[in-house]
Every structure is written in C-alpha cells, then in structure tokens.
Amino acid sequence: MSTKNLLLELFVEELPPKALKKIGEAFAQTLQASLQTQGLLSADSVLTAFASPRRLGVHLTKVLEQADDKTVMQKLMPAAVGIGADGKATPALLKKLAALGADESAVAGLKRESDGKAEVLFFNSVVTGVMLTDGLQKALEETLGKLPIPKVMAYQLADGWETVNFVRPAHGLVALYGADVLNISVLGLHAGNTTHGHRFEAGIDPVYIRDADSYAKQIATEGAVIASFAERRAEIVRQLASAAAEAGSNLTPIEDEALLDEVTGLVERPNVLIGQFEEAFLEVPQECLILTMKANQKYFPLLDSKGGLSNKFLIVSNIRPADASTVIGGNERVVRPRLADAKFFFDQDRKKTLMSRVAGLDKVVYHNKLGTQGERIARVRAIAQAIAGKLGVDAQQADTAAQLAKADLLTDMVGEFPELQGIMGRYYALHDGLPAAVADAIEDHYKPRFAGDELPRNPVGMVVALADKLETLVGLFSIGQVPTGDKDPFALRRHALGIIRMLIEGKLDIGINDLITAAEKPFNGLSAEHRSALLNFIFDRLANALREQGYSAQEIDAVLALQPQRLADVAERLAAVRAFAALPEAASLAAANKRVGNILKKVEGTVAAQVDTALLKEPAEIALNQTLTTVKPQAEAAFARGDYTASLQALAALRNPVDAFFDGVMVNAEDIALRNNRQGLLATLHQAMNQVADISKLAA
C-alpha cells in the first residue's frame, strides 16, 4: 500500500518552559506509538518532533492511508457445547457466530484445537484495517490524555458553552497527509493547513503549510520560528559560545543544562546578546549573583578561565531587532536592582556574627515531634563529638562547625535564596574570623546532596556531615517516619547514600553500628525494632548502589548478609567473593556452607565453635578437624590484615575433607557427646567460612 508523510501541529498559548522538553517528547513518542500499534506506520517510518513555546508538532514519514487487514483467530467455546450429538451447530454457537457477523455456513470452517483442558472451537475472522483519519483521531486523543502536564487549565471555547481542559488554551490544529488535510478535531478545534509563526517577527501571518514536508522550512522562513526543540537548543549553544568569545577571550558561559532547556522553552527565535553590570557588585559572593541572574532573569553569567564571575552576562532574547541596544539596556536595568538586593542582604547579614544567630534557632520548628532547630543542633553537636573522638578529628572544630551549621538559615540572603544554605554560612564564618576548616565544614555538611556530588573537603566537614545525616535518620526512624514506596519527603534515602559514600570513599575507620549508637544517645536510645529497621534500610541502600555499579545479586547478598561494619572494606570483600567464585572448589564449598547453616539452625540454643579431639572417632571428622586447624588460622590472619581474597582462597583446601565428612559421618549421632562435638566442629567450620562473606549465598 502506498504511503505519504504526516504532519501534525497543535498551536497553543505559551507552554510551561521548564516542562516543554518533556511534554514535546511525550507528545511525539506517544502519538507515534499509538499509530504504530494501529498498524499505520511502515517499519522504517522516521519521527521528527517539534516543540516550541507555542506549538507541539510531529512529522512522520511513510504513513499508511489504511492499516492492513488482519486475520484474527478467536476462541469461541468448547466443541462439546458448540456441536451437538447430531454433528450440527447448537443455538449457542450460531448466536456467537451471528455476533461476529457470520452465519451457519461458517461452521464447516471452524478449527478445533485443544486448550489443554478440552477441545475448543476457533473462528478465523478478518478485521478491516483502520483508516488513517480514524487512527489519528484516536492517537491524538490518547496522546493528549497521557501528556506529563504539571497543571491543567480549564477554559471555555468561543461558543461560550463548552469547557476544555488542557495545559494551555489551544488555538489551532494542522493535520496534513502529504498535501491533504485530514478530517480530525480535538480540544474544540478542526484540523486545517494554517498556523501562526513568531508572535512579533513572522513575515507572513497566518502561514499556509503547503504539505507535510514543507512545514519545518515554512515555519522558519515565513514564521521566523525554529520549531524543533533540539535544533533551537543547539542554536542557542552556538550563539552562547560565539557571544562569549566576543565578550572576552577568556570568558565562557556557565554550564547549566536545566537553564539551557528552560531558555529553549522560552524562545522561538533565539538571539543571544551581551549585557553587563557594575564591577562593584562583584564584591558579593559570586554564588549569590549567579543564582539571582539564573533563577530570576534566565541569564547565562560569564566566567573567566579560573571560574571567577565576570561583570558580563548573556541574554537569550526572543527577538532580533536591527538595534539591540534597547533590549540590552532594558535587561541591564532589570538585573541591577536584583544585584543591589543581593549586595544589601550580604552587607546586612555581616553585621551580625553567626554565633549571635544560634539562639534564634530555638524559635525555628524542625519537626513537631522532634523539636526546634536549636534542639536538633544540640543533638548534632553531641553526635559530632562522638564521631570526632572515634576518628581522631579535632573535636573543638567539629563542635563549632556543628553549632553554626544551621545559623545561616536566619540570614536575609538564605531567606531569599534557600539554595545558598551552607554556602553563605561559609562566607559569614570566614568574615567572623573562624578557621577555614570550620567554615568549609559549615558549607560541606550538606554534602553529598545528590548522586555524583563531591564529598566534604576536610575531616571536620566529614564528621559534621555524618552527624547531621545520622541525626535526621535516627530521629525520623524513632518516630516512625520512614520512606514508603516512592514517597520520601525527608530525603532519607539520599541521607543514607550520603553516609554510605562518605564511609566508603572516605575510607573511614568506623563501624556502622558505632555510628548508630552515637546517633541514638541524644534521643535516649532507639527501640530494637527501629534500630534494626534503620540498619536494614542503610544496607538496602548500599545493595541498590552496588547493583548500579555492576555487582551481581549473589555477590552482594554474600557480602551484605554479614552486615559488615566497616563499609570502606565492602569493595575489597566483593572482589574477594568474585575471585573465590571462580575457583573450582567454590560451588562445592558454597553448597556445603549452606548445608552446615541449615544443620546448625535446627539445633536448639547456640552451638559453641569448639572441638574435643578425644571425641573425634571417624577418619573423616578427624581429617576435617586437622585441615581446619591449619586453614582457619591462615584465613583469620589474612582477614585480619585485610587480604580478603587470600582469606577466602585459603578455604579451597577444605573441599575434599568437607565432602568426605558429609559422606562418612552422621552428625546427629545417638550419643549426645558425639553429636554435640560434631555440631561444634561444624560451628567451627561455619565460623571459618563466613568471615569475609556468607559464601552459602553463592550456592545455585
């Protein structure tokens, strides 16, 4: 069947810029998927998506005018129900066939097949392929219903009666199959071949689209619009680089993918211009200036070769006037008060020391069940003191940093820009004459804030960051505020991962149980249930992180089953398990370890790992004990020096003695003394085999 190319455009009022990329991709991909499902696209059909502030569009090549007919085999009923004893169709079968548009003449062509229970009648029917107009109508309605729209608007159509719900009011619909207009409608609009270009700079309005393939070129030349989100974004990147080079040889625009996407969603005809502000504003911390330019004005600040902020910035305008000075001047006038506000906040904040603000935290509620920020800081200080003592970090500096960590929450700058919490605390601490290690720790105690974020830059920061995150975890677990499903309002998963990363990447010599013990003391302890839940939560987060790094489920289960306390060793344990699993003895020893564990579980009480050699009677148990006497010290010595691979590989010598033991020795002997001694031998074996990891997890 012949094909043509398809063009669809929905013309709307300005779409949310932050959501435009996602909405545009969803619009194109969902529409394509629906048409594909209906059989209206060729196998090699190519999709081109369009998304600009005022339009969502799709271009598809090789679209069928009608889908191919399909033969569908439909299950009817058991043959015993459909065919009577006389061999003729029963009324029930005839009624079913009539519903499918067939009569008694179709009975002879019915197929009989078993469905595993009985012989069943099947009817082959031909389903006529859907027409493009009908299929596109269905696809468009489905697509609009599935868009990831942040908020929906309700508006009335021109008739004043009908109400429509969509992200923004829609004003036009183009649907072209080749040069033919398709008869579809949606959101109270009927498809045509006219659209509108740039709000201010279109050369022709309306723009009459000749055919599906001319859309992109016509909307660009006649409508002054780059309709493709990707092309418009690339053009902005090109212009930013060009303008930065023009502004100064060593200047580069700040890299911010989210800002770039948002600006791409704001303009249809990008034009990058250079603006500047007074150098006096550079006395303000550059993070403040950068944030106000990006968040409030959507500008791209220019940085020098050392990463320092210059007094120039780039504006992505939506118009291209012959004389851009008015546009530039207007933007410079707008940004100046913003920068002046930032300077005012900075100057005012420095009139009070951070220490003088600490008392004010007693009036800031942290959680109605956990008290104020002041009470929270007291807990963080106590936890930080305990951790600093165990890690040999300057306890006084850790205490000061913990005490001042949240003080900047009461400053004007952080009140205006919450994203600067910690950052401003560092600047104000340095202004107050505090040591750099303390100032850095105040900023860094929030780190790592997200996947890939850097860790605190010094030991004091590491201690306070651990204390802050542990206080949050222990406090919220103590009142039952744990993450459920996708809901994690207090970012506890992120806090747990932050702790894990600091322990592993920082190679901190402290156990996870020691940390929880230190953190629970200011809360007067955790219940056994809450402590166990928190420990499992942390190890679950670690398991997820390790899976993302490519470790197998068996390897992870083997190591984490023991809940190793020093997380800095986890990578070495995993490497040792992987090397052990490659040994020819591994499978047999893993199975044996599993068997030993099952035997010991059935014994009432705890089995002591000790052996009375005088009670060893069978040659196999004597041989196993002798081998254990040699192997166990070797494995323990390697474990003690951190050579986990050698520790596990030493176990290989146990394979034959263990196999012989299970082949020739009755563990549960009738003689109680023999039975207890053999159980003690197995407990000793189990102890030796489960120092680095629970190798039974490697059993098939």
UniProtKB/Swiss-Prot annotation:
Keyword annotations: Aminoacyl-tRNA synthetase, ATP-binding, Cytoplasm, Ligase, Nucleotide-binding, Protein biosynthesis
Chief subcellular location: cytoplasm
Protein name stated in the entry: Glycine--tRNA ligase beta subunit
Gene from which the chain derives: glyS
InterPro entries: DALR_anticod-bd, Gly-tRNA-synth_bsu, Gly-tRNA-synth_heterodimer
UniProt similarity note: Belongs to the class-II aminoacyl-tRNA synthetase family.
Disulfide bonds: none
UniProt cross-references to SUPFAM superfamilies, sorted A to Z: HD-domain/PDEase-like (SSF109604)
Catalytic reactions of this protein: tRNA(Gly) + glycine + ATP = glycyl-tRNA(Gly) + AMP + diphosphate
Organism: Janthinobacterium sp. (strain Marseille) (Minibacterium massiliensis)
GO process annotations (BP): arginyl-tRNA aminoacylation; glycyl-tRNA aminoacylation
Enzyme class: ligase
Sections of the chain in a coiled coil: none
